[in-house]
Every structure is written in C-alpha cells, then in structure tokens.
C-alpha cells in the first residue's frame, strides 16, 4: 500500500491536532539516608517547610529540616522498605485533612482516614492542619458556659465557650474520665466534640469509644487516634488534625469542644523527631520550639465574633459567634507541675484543673485540688444560679483544709471552728461524684443550695451521698416545673430561692434518706 504526499501530510496534521500536551512541574529528589523514620533527600531545590513529599506506595513524608544541600523529612507511616537511591517528589501541598459533619460519630487516624470499619467518610472538603489562629480583633470575649456536669468544676472552676482549660495531674488520677464525662454532658447541648488520643494503647481508646457510644455521645463526636505503636510523626500531628476538624464548626458559627489526651505524649513524640533530625536539645532534651508547638495549637481555640463568621461563610451565616473550647491534658511526674512542659502549657491556657493522687486515693473523686485549680476567664461565663450559690463553696473548702491541718495539733476547738470543720467535711463529701454521671444545672443548683443554706448540718457524713440522691429524686418528682425552669434559663431570683427553700424544708422533714 502506497500513500501519496497529501495523505501523509493530512495524517501528520491529524496526529498533531490529537496530541495533548500534559506538563506537570514536579521537583524530584533522591533519598540518601534512612534511619528511625527520618529520611534525608538530595536534589529537592524547591520545597516548603512542612510540605508533603510523595514516596513510593502512596505514602508521604513531611519536610521539617531545610538544609543547604539536603532536606530532612519525617515519614508518616512504615519506612522499612525505603532505601538509599529511591526517587521522591514534592507535591506543592501542606498536609490537609478531611473536615465536615460526615466525620461526626467516626473514628479516624491522623490523616482523617476511617479506622472504625464503617466505610468511607462523606466529608465537606479539606482543611490544612496548620492554620494561623484568629487575631485579636476577630475574637469575642468568653461569656457562655460549657457545662462539664461536674459540681466541683462548674461551681468552682467554670469553663466558658472558647476557653482553654488545662486538666493536669499524675497518671491514674481521673484526667481522661473528667474529659470524657465533659463530652458525654454535651450530648444534648448542641456542642460538637473532638477527642484526640495521642500515644495511648489501642485497647484504652476502644474502651473510650465504647463508653461514648453507650451514653449516646459518639453521634456528635469525632475521635482522632494516633496510638502508641504509630509513627512519632503521626502522634505529633494528631492534635493539629483534630483542631482543623473542630475549627470547621467554629468558623461556621457553631460551638465545638476539643480534648487533647494528652499533650505530654505529643511533646515526647516531637522531641523524638527533633533529636533524630539533629536539632540542638534544650531543657529536658526538648527542642527550643516546644513552647511554640503547644502555643500555636492552643491559640486556635477561641470564640470568634459575628463578623468573622459572616466573612468566612460569605454571608451564609449572620449574627452568630463560633467557638472552639480546648481541654488539653498534661501528665505530671510525682505531682511536679514545675517541669518544662507543664509550666509551658499552664502559661498558655486560661486556667487549670489540678487532680491530686492523694485526694484520688482517699476516695475524693473527682480529685480536684481547689487550692491551686483556677479558671481565669470562666467566671464571666458561669450560669447565674450556680454563680450566685457557689460563692461560699471554694471558701468553705479552703478554710476546711487550713483548719483540718491546724486541728491535728490543737486539742480543744471552739464551737465556731468545729462548725467550720463540720461544714467543710460535708461540702467535701458532697463534691464527690461517680463517673459517667454528669449532673444538670438544676441538679447542681439543688445540691449546692442544700450545702450553702445549712441543710447538711444534721446529716451523717456517710449518708451525705444518699441524702443528695434522695433530694434530687424528690425535687424531680415534686418540683418538676422548677427543675425545668432552672435547666432552661439558669436564672436565680427570690421566687426560685423561696421554692427551693420550701422544697428542701419539706424533704428534710420526711427523713427519707
């Protein structure tokens, strides 16, 4: 078969027209060293700090050290098969995670991939894990409460929406239990929750997820997991991933609560990465920027104003503020709050709840030490009735501690001192609360009212718990309208006080506890 010149020319023209030019500018480099999850790459001339680097097998590394002739990157995942000479590429992207309502009720890893076996996630888009926190002008003061359901916390150390309240204490003092109860208490409050588990056992996390499901709180909670067996890079990044997921709700005029459990393990993971990258160690072998590690994370928890939300949503949401409340957890060693990471996080947050081993072992749970626990901004957000009634609780407990120590050496005590001791020991007993049993505002108000107005005076110490349970049951059945009113409004006036007093007088007369 012979083709003439015209046919050949037409065929070439046709081929040229059909040819599609696909150009992709990708910077390529070569791995020159692999050790302990850290790779050194030569040849990446154009790479950003924190950029994702594509590795073979759908894996990524994050560029952390940008040096003159090489790049130090940390691998997110297994690295045993990586070897010298393997080609890698830049992506031009910072790490992003999926965000949206589709994540609620799901358990995901640091990268936002589902690990609960419930199928793919229907996300609303992606968000970078590292975001600059809202500025001063974009924020609004904290004046709405987050009810934890704990009398000891809501009365003495109140937390507001947009606040950062540290939960600090030794191991096995009830830190996680307090945070999980706070999440369970948001079941009907409309606050979306994010629980970030860093460096924990998989069995512990499975137990937490099961408890959240049992109490109906998993449906409005996202669980982000980086277990102890996962790469240090994933443990270091997990809190930032969870924060990005929580910010999705804040920026759309909603309220969210995030628990970081715990930031001590995140700091250890970051220390490991920094030392392997040959960064100079500082105090306790942590790198120099460990303060910035936590400050840039916790500053993202905030209450943003109406203008910020309106601008972010392009006018879709107007007249609403958004908030992200953070409950970071720090584990201390032998109660040493003056160590490097605890002092850093105490100085960043808006207050701390200090849980003590001695109190926990003595049966006082939650083991809150009211002497050194404080909330710096929550007072403005406290529910009116709790604020009015709880003023004397902290004073009573502080005086009781002081007098109890003094009374060990004094043989005879005057009546006033003995009365203070009696009152203090009963208030301490009243502050005890079982796990997974958060209390409503009205229930807390009734209990505190009973303590403040002297109704516990004639109650045996070991019967205080029974007295409270019977009292709450009585008030719920006989004064249901009052309980409903307090729960809905949180108000306190002469009428409410009179009805509470009348209810308690009747109950005490029955002696049914």
From Swiss-Prot:
Its main location: membrane. Keywords: ATP synthesis, ATP-binding, Cell inner membrane, Cell membrane, CF(1), Hydrogen ion transport, Ion transport, Membrane, Nucleotide-binding, Translocase, Transport. It is found in: Cell inner membrane. The keyword Cell membrane applies. It comes from Shewanella sp. (strain ANA-3). It is a peripheral membrane protein. It is an enzyme of class 7 (translocase). It comes from the Bacteria. PANTHER family: ATP SYNTHASE SUBUNIT ALPHA, MITOCHONDRIAL. One of its GO terms (molecular function) is ATP binding. GO terms for cellular component: plasma membrane; proton-transporting ATP synthase complex. InterPro entries: ATP_synth_asu-like_sf (IPR023366), ATP_synth_asu_C (IPR000793), ATP_synth_asu_C_sf (IPR038376), ATP_synth_F1_a_nt-bd_dom (IPR033732), ATP_synth_F1_asu (IPR005294), ATPase_a/bsu_AS (IPR020003), ATPase_F1/V1/A1_a/bsu_N (IPR004100), ATPase_F1/V1/A1_a/bsu_N_sf (IPR036121). It catalyses: ATP + H2O + 4 H(+)(in) = ADP + phosphate + 5 H(+)(out). ATP binds at residues 169-176. Produces ATP from ADP in the presence of a proton gradient across the membrane. The alpha chain is a regulatory subunit. Belongs to the ATPase alpha/beta chains family. The record marks 373 as: Required for activity. The keyword Lipid metabolism does not apply. The gene is atpA. This is ATP synthase subunit alpha. Its EC number is 7.1.2.2. F-type ATPases have 2 components, CF(1) - the catalytic core - and CF(0) - the membrane proton channel. CF(1) has five subunits: alpha(3), beta(3), gamma(1), delta(1), epsilon(1). CF(0) has three main subunits: a(1), b(2) and c(9-12). The alpha and beta chains form an alternating ring which encloses part of the gamma chain. CF(1) is attached to CF(0) by a central stalk formed by the gamma and epsilon chains, while a peripheral stalk is formed by the delta and b chains.
């Amino acid at each position: 078969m012979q083709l003439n010149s015209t046919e050949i020319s037409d065929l070439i023209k046709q081929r040229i027209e059909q040819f599609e030019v696909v150009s992709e500018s990708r910077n390529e480099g070569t791995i020159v060293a692999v050790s302990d999850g850290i790779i050194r790459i030569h040849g990446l001339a154009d790479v950003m700090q924190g950029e994702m680097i594509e590795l073979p097998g759908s894996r990524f590394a994050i560029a952390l050290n940008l040096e003159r002739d090489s790049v130090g990157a940390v691998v997110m995942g297994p690295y045993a098969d990586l070897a010298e000479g393997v080609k890698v590429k830049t992506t031009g992207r910072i790490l992003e995670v999926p965000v949206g309502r589709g994540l609620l009720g799901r358990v995901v890893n640091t990268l936002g991939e589902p690990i609960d076996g419930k199928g793919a996630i229907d996300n609303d888009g992606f968000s970078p894990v590292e975001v600059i926190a809202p500025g001063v002008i974009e924020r609004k003061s904290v004046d709405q409460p987050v009810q934890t359901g704990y009398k000891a916390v809501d009365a003495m150390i109140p937390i507001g929406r947009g606040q950062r309240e540290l939960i600090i204490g030794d191991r096995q003092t009830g830190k996680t239990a307090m945070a999980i109860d706070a999440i369970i208490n948001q079941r009907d409050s409309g606050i979306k929750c994010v629980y970030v588990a860093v460096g924990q056992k998989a069995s512990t996390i499975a137990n937490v997820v099961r408890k959240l499901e049992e109490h109906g709180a998993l449906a409005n909670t996202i669980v982000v997991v980086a277990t102890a067996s996962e790469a240090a890079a994933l443990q270091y990044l997990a809190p930032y991933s969870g924060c990005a997921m929580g910010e999705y709700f804040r920026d759309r005029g909603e309220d969210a609560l995030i628990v970081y459990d715990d930031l001590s393990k995140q700091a250890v993971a970051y220390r490991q990465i920094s030392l392997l990258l040959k960064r100079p160690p500082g105090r306790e072998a942590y790198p120099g920027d460990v303060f910035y590690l936590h400050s840039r994370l916790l500053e993202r928890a905030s209450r943003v104003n109406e203008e910020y939300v309106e601008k972010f949503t392009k006018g879709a949401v107007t007249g609403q503020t958004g908030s992200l409340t953070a409950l970071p957890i720090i584990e201390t060693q032998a109660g040493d709050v003056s160590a490097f990471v605890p002092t850093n996080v105490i100085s960043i947050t808006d207050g701390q709840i200090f849980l003590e081993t001695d109190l926990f072992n003595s049966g006082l749970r939650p083991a809150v030490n009211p002497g050194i626990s404080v909330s710096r901004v929550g007072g403005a957000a406290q529910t009116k009735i709790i604020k009015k009634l709880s003023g004397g609780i902290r004073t009573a407990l502080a005086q009781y501690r002081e007098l109890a120590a003094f009374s060990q050496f004094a043989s005879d005590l005057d009546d006033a001192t003995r009365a203070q001791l009696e009152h203090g020991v009963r208030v301490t007993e009243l502050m005890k609360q079982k796990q997974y049993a958060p209390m409503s505002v009205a229930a807390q108000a009734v209990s505190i009212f009973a303590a403040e107005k002297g109704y516990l005076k004639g109650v045996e110490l070991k019967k205080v718990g029974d007295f409270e349970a019977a009292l709450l049951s009585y008030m719920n059945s006989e004064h249901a309208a009052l309980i409903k009113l307090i729960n809905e409004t949180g108000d306190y006036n002469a009428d409410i006080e009179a009805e509470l007093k009348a209810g308690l007088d009747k109950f005490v007369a029955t002696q049914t506890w």
